[in-house]
């Protein structure tokens, strides 16, 4: 049974199903038989074989009517029936068990309503949705239910009742975008009721209160079509924000602002001019944008938008290549706003633009000017770093050393000080195969787990950054003694928060109260019902509410970890370290580090590592950076699963591996994602001469780009890392390697220098 459960957890449902069937065929004990039947039905459902899942659940429900998991089983059975369009079977199952469901009763009623609505049984659907509302205590669920009620009333032509539902939704505390959508839809209902004045009032509210919303634009169009008079300033804002999705709207914004500015009373003339200039910039009308910004500067000397206008003028001039004018404008801006971070940001942008355009020497001067003029600016340390790197690439080693020494002396806590100390050490130890100097000693002391410290330690030890350093032995299961871990965390919290002494002496209190929290009860119930995405969404809301509460974050980190929600546990732990006055995760207790650097799916990591001669902890570090061990993770670019493989790459890798029945959704299955990720990393190591950092850069940025970056510096590894054109790829390789060493420290007991 343990093997079957492991296959199921790893997403290898075919193996899990075969294992459960084998158990049932070999005279299991009553307990084993019950467990095998329950998890067999689960596996069918998770695999997408809904007909088999429905049959398996029906058998389980009939065979074990007293099982405490029946409410969850009923939900999963109903989900299977609905997937094969058999609502006539789903509804009775839900109705039989809804009264025994204490946490997800609203969801059961909602699904009953969905089934009735799908079969045009509207009275039954309305009754089910109302029953769901009666038991729901979650605002988001209430809003969703009321939308479904409103939809039915609209389909039936009962606009007044639909409108009442929209009004009820608007009384809930929801985000601005959602509020704007409901307001807009309510306006459409009023228009259908032939109540144009009320409809227009709704549209006006959207335009005036939420001009950034995507529903401000259609509201504006509806008002314009009706010939309704609209505040031209608000119209300009709404058109401007709509321009991000519809470029033509920028032109409409400019015209609206012009009409506003032509009026006799223009109390927001400065703000209108500012957004007009931004719209002109977006349309490529640079001369017009500069003229508009100049109008703010000359005509509104006391405007709160004046500083922003100066900033935009500096950056706009720099974008056109008028660097001298941009710098002169910046100096005028500093004269007016000597302590302005926006002025510093303007010069920072100018320097970045010049460096990106290849004018590196000019950029280095600007970076130095920025740091000397604005030493407290958030990018001041990075400015010195970039100036030093530019000098180094130009063979001005003295200039580079000066910049990096200033950085190391002035910005000790800056993440860029580690790089400065590393390169100062390289300069000091030039020509020595075993550089030993105070810069590297200081680096290792101040930043022990930073890429640069690890690189220095690696050079000193003579250990190559290749696969020869891999330890390929299988990992043991990752576990800890919960009470001991909680006690350690509480003792640490007591040192810098107001955690009660009674809590510290009774570590069980850390998680004991969690079962009393309805939203966490709901999270657990959703997970037990196979609804992981819904559970994660619920947990995200809980985490958001606890974001600034150290004790709550500690509790949540343990709760999420215990529910295999590793990404949420890690985020809770990382946030807790951020709230700590020292603010350095690497100095936090080992318990917190283990929460922030989880180790899951060790059987998969070990199997793939041995098969491909990899280190399983390198795979763990890669997966942590990619997905924080969340199997359902999906990036904005479309990468999926634990290893964040792109669908196109996944298809190619699956062909190479002979996965005949591969489908894109398999990327969400841990055993597939880990295998593809390990195979891809192995391939890249082979392509790039077994160099770990280079292969990691290629994993993120692609082998073609990586080859160009490597060739541009003639294979110099340190310069390769510094000159990777894609910031994300540079950060990725560093973070994965840093994580690799942290994993070794946590789970192998080695030190960075070993």
Predicted region positions:
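Gram-negative outer-membrane assembly/targeting C-terminal domains
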Residues: 723-726, 731-734, 739-754
């Amino acid at each position: 049974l343990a093997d079957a459960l492991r296959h199921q957890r790893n997403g290898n449902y075919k193996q899990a199903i075969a294992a459960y069937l084998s158990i049932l065929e070999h005279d299991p004990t009553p307990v084993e038989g019950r467990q095998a039947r329950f998890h067999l039905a689960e596996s069918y459902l998770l695999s997408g074989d809904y007909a088999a899942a429905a049959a398996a659940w029906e058998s389980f429900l009939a065979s074990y009517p007293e099982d405490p998991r029946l409410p969850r089983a009923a939900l999963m059975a109903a989900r299977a029936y609905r997937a094969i369009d058999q609502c006539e079977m789903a509804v009775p199952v839900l109705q039989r068990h809804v009264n025994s469901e204490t946490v997800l009763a609203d969801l059961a009623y909602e699904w009953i309503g969905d089934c009735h609505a799908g079969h045009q049984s509207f009275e039954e659907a309305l009754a089910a949705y109302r029953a769901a509302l009666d038991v729901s205590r979650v605002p988001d669920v209430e809003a969703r239910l009321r939308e479904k009620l409103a939809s039915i009333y609209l389909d039936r032509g009962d606009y007044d009742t639909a409108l009442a539902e929209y009004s009820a939704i608007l009384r809930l505390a929801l985000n601005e975008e959602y509020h704007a959508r409901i307001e807009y839809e309510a306006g459409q209902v009023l228009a259908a009721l032939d109540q144009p004045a009320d409809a227009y009032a709704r549209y006006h509210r959207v335009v005036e209160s939420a001009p950034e919303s995507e529903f401000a634009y259609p509201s504006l169009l509806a008002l314009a079509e009706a010939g309704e008079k609209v505040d031209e300033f608000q119209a300009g804002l709404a058109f401007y924000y709509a321009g991000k999705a519809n470029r033509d709207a920028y032109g409409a914004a400019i015209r609206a602002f012009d009409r506003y500015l032509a009026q006799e009373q223009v109390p927001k003339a400065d703000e209108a001019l500012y957004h007009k200039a931004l719209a002109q910039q977006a349309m490529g009308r640079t001369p017009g944008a500069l003229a508009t910004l100049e109008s703010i500067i000359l005509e509104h000397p006391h405007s709160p938008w004046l500083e922003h206008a100066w900033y935009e003028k500096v950056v706009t001039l720099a974008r056109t290549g008028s660097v001298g004018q941009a710098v002169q404008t910046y100096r005028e801006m500093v004269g007016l706003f000597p302590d302005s971070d926006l002025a510093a940001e303007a010069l920072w942008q100018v320097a970045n633009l010049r460096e990106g355009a290849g004018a590196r020497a000019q950029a280095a001067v600007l970076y130095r000017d920025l740091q000397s003029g604005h030493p407290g600016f958030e990018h001041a340390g990075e400015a010195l770093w970039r100036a030093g790197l530019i000098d180094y690439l130009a063979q001005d080693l003295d200039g580079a050393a000066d910049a990096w020494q200033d950085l190391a002396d002035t910005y000790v806590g800056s993440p860029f000080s580690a790089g400065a100390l590393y390169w100062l050490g390289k300069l000091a130890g030039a020509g020595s195969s075993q550089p030993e100097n105070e810069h590297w000693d200081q680096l290792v002391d101040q930043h022990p787990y930073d890429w640069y410290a690890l690189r220095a330690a690696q050079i000193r030890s003579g250990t190559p950054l290749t696969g020869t350093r891999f330890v390929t032995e299988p990992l043991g299961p990752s576990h800890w003694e919960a009470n001991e871990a909680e006690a350690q965390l509480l003792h640490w919290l007591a040192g810098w928060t107001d955690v009660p002494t009674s809590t510290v002496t009774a570590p069980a209190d850390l998680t004991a109260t969690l079962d009393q929290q309805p939203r966490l009860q709901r999270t657990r119930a959703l997970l037990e019902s196979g609804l992981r995405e819904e559970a994660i969404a619920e947990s995200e809301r809980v985490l958001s509410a606890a974001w600034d509460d150290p004790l709550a974050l500690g509790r949540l980190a343990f709760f999420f970890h215990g529910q295999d929600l590793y990404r949420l546990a890690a985020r809770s732990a990382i946030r807790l370290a951020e709230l700590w006055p020292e603010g350095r995760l690497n100095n936090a207790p080992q318990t917190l580090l283990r929460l922030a650097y989880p180790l899951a799916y060790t059987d998969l990591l070990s199997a793939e590592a041995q098969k491909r001669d990899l280190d399983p902890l390198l795979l763990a570090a890669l997966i942590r950076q990619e997905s924080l061990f969340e199997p359902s993770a999906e990036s904005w670019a479309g990468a999926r699963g634990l290893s964040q493989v792109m669908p196109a790459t996944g298809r190619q890798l699956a062909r190479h591996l002979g996965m005949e029945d591969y489908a894109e959704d398999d990327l969400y299955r841990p055993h597939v994602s880990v295998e593809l990720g390990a195979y891809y990393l192995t391939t890249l190591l082979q392509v790039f001469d077994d160099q770990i950092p280079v292969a990691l850069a290629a994993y993120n940025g692609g082998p073609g780009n990586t080859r160009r970056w490597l060739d541009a510096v003639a294979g110099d590894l340190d310069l390769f890392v510094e000159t990777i054109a894609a910031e994300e790829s540079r950060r990725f390789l560093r973070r994965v390697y840093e994580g690799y060493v942290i994993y070794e420290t946590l789970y192998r007991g080695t030190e960075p220098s070993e």
